Amino acid sequence: RFVFQSEVLFTTGSADLGGEGKTQIIQLAGTLKEIIKKIPPKIEWILRVDGHTDRVPIQTSRFPSNWELSTARAISVVKFLVGQGISPTNLAATGFGEFQPIDPRDDEIANLRNRRIELKLTQR
C-alpha cells in the first residue's frame, strides 16, 4: 500500500497533478514496474487508486462535491500512471470523498491526514 498526502500531489481544490506530484508518481511508477516484474503471469492483479478528501464541503462547477474531487484526483493519477507505462487493464480509479477518513477528529490535522491518495496492489 502506498499513501500520498493530497498536498504533495495537488493544489487545493484541484485534480491536476502538480510538478512535485508528477515527480512522485514517476518514482512510484518505477517502483511499480519492478514489483510487476515479480508477479507470476497467472496471477491477475489490479492497482486500485483511491482518492479521499477531508470533510470540508466543496461546491464548484467542476466539483459539486468531494466525491467528484476525490474521483477526479484518482483518475488523474491513473492516467499519469498509464503515461508512465503501467497497463490500464491493471488500474482502477475510485473516489471515496470524505466518507472513509483515517482520522475521525474535526480539526486541521485530521483534515490534512484525510486528504490523500491510497494505492493498493491486490489480486483481482
Regions found by a protein language model. Give the residues of each.
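Short edge beta-strands and adjacent turn/loop segments
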Residues: 1, 44-45
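Charged linear interaction tracts used for macromolecular binding and regulation
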Residues: 1-2, 23, 37
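Extended, gly/pro-poor, charged amphipathic helical "stalk/hinge" elements that serve as dimerization
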Residues: 1-9
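Periplasmic OmpA-like peptidoglycan-binding domain that tethers envelope proteins to the cell wall
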Residues: 9-27, 45, 52-124
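Alpha-helix termini
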Residues: 33-42
